[in-house]
Amino acid sequence: MLYIGIDLGTSAVKLLLMDSEGNIRNIVSREYPLYFPHPGWSEQKPEDWYEQTMEGIRELLKDADKSQVAGISFGGQMHGLVILDEKDQVIRPAILWNDGRTTEECDYLNNVIGKEKLSEYTANTVSYTHLRAHE
């Protein structure tokens, strides 16, 4: 049996193919660009993630018996924001964990609601209020 691990990182997607004994059969890394449209902003195109992941899987499995793949696991960036429309289509570049455009809104909400309570309600940092006000 073979297993695939996928790590969607900030600068690249890393893929690993491992057998049931824990032997690494193949490792692939596919880079994608970061975009900085304004100072302090950090974005990526989810389409780039998808394309590089799919290409990476093809490369990872090129010499493997695909019928032996028994499992796949994913990991990725935390606290990114991917906005979808009502048809689950991406409508703008993803706002990444290291983006600083929402500092003012985050400070306001943390002061008004309280950082602990806000985290309890949302289980994430505040970033969507900036979009409502500016996009």
Where does each model-flagged region fall?
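N-terminal glycine/serine-rich phosphate-binding loop of ATP-dependent small-molecule kinases
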Residues: 1-92
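Short, glycine/acidic-enriched loop or turn micro-motifs at the edges of active sites
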Residues: 10, 102, 135
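Acidic-residue sensor for enzyme active/binding pockets
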Residues: 43, 105, 135
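Carbohydrate-associated surface elements
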Residues: 99
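Short glycine/proline- and acidic residue-enriched helix-loop micro-motifs
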Residues: 115-125
